[in-house]
């Protein structure tokens, strides 16, 4: 999981994952969307692939990349307790603000 965190810390790699979230794409589509060079996109894809976050398949002349969700699920599971913590704190803040509004009206 630590490797996945290190890999997704880079903004272009997160953007690549975002672009691949809904559908597999060839490198050219990623280059166009990111506005960075093809070698740079390929380097990021290699890092993502080495970390197990994306996989590639060949379709005729094209190499299509897609997200592998399994490593991201590990991150999601690790983050779950923190989501509950923040959800509770935000709920507490909302209650406090509602009480302040009620006190001002009284």
Task: Walk through the language-model features, giving the residues of each.
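C-terminal regulatory/oligomerization modules of transcriptional regulators
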Residues: 19-33, 38, 50-55, 70-106
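Pre-recognition alpha-helix immediately N-terminal to the DNA-recognition helix
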Residues: 3, 14-15
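Short helix-coil-helix linker/hinge
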Residues: 7-12
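Base-recognition residues in the alpha-helical recognition helix of bacterial helix-turn-helix
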Residues: 18, 42-46
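Short, Lys/Arg-rich nucleic-acid/phosphate-binding segment
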Residues: 58-64
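Short, intrinsically disordered or compositionally biased N-terminal tails of bacterial proteins
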Residues: 1-4, 106
């Amino acid at each position: 999981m630590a490797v996945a965190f290190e890999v997704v810390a880079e903004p272009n790699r997160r953007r690549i994952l975002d672009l691949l979230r809904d559908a597999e794409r060839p490198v050219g589509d990623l280059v166009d969307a990111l506005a960075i060079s093809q070698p740079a996109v390929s380097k990021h894809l290699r890092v993502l692939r080495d970390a197990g976050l994306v996989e590639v398949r060949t379709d005729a002349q094209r190499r299509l990349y897609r997200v592998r969700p399994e490593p991201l699920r590990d991150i999601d599971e690790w983050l779950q307790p923190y989501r509950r913590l923040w959800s509770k704190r935000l709920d507490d803040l909302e209650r406090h603000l509602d009480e302040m509004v009620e006190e001002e009206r009284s």
